[in-house]
Amino acid sequence: MKKIAIFAKVHDPRCVGIAEELVEWLLARGLSPLVEPHLAKHISCSYTAKRDDIPEQADLVVVLGGDGTLISVARLVGDRQVPILGVNLGSLGFLTEITLTEMYPALERCLKGDYEVSERMMLRVSLHRGGAEIEGRQVLNDVVINKGALARIIDLETEVDGRYLTTFKADGLIISTPTGSTGYSLSANGPIIHPQLDCLVITPICPHTLTNRPIVVSGDALITISLQSVNEDVFLTLDGQVGFEVKHGDQIRIQRAERQTRLVQSRSKDYFEVLRTKLKWGER
């Protein structure tokens, strides 16, 4: 590994300061840091590259921040499959499981090739209108179709592999990966899914029919959702960060992406320890 990309929350002085220290650490070892211009101007770094070009150049990506920062970088990396080392400087940190004290030892191991990655499923999401695809993206956590604040409940006709499932009458619908099962889906009473399981979760948001419950389907499933409601404000949100308006008759198709996100794992904790810590299990 020679080229190490750094992404950080530029509005967090602590993240910016650590990014500056990391650049110096890399240079002292004869490595080439890659920093997007927006961050570079905060740390007086001349080793810049356009944000969209970084995944093609980097051998490793270091993310300083929280899960939100890592999720946005995972979408950017996309098919490139560069390993991502997430350093938790945020609050919750299900994905950024490397602590600040672990960062430099973890980097040393990565440079020696002595590291393990957790491969996480990503989704390919496309929005179709009038028979044509008008948007297509990859997501790591979840896809959410929900109504605006003043809209009534919406009707979402849902198929799995071309077979009719039901028409959800609800405030919305969440389709999550196992990684995303601890996000919005969990708040809507969805199950916690181990990230190595090969499945997707369909979770209704405040369904009108009380027997509508979250359902787990195959990771190879093609989920098709059609908006049947008329004159309602409805939105498609990807990973809680990118959004599009959905109109009557639009169709949303969701399936496994071709590539996975590769997250460098912590040596000091496992998935269940992360769950216990973040969800405060066993505390009184």
Swiss-Prot record:
Signal peptide: none annotated. GO terms for molecular function: ATP binding; metal ion binding; NAD binding; NAD+ kinase activity. The active site is at D67 (proton acceptor). It comes from the Bacteria. GO terms for biological process: NAD metabolic process; NADP biosynthetic process. NAD(+) binds at D67, G68, N141, D142, R152, K169, D171, T182, G183, Y184, S185, L186, S187, Q241. This is NAD kinase.
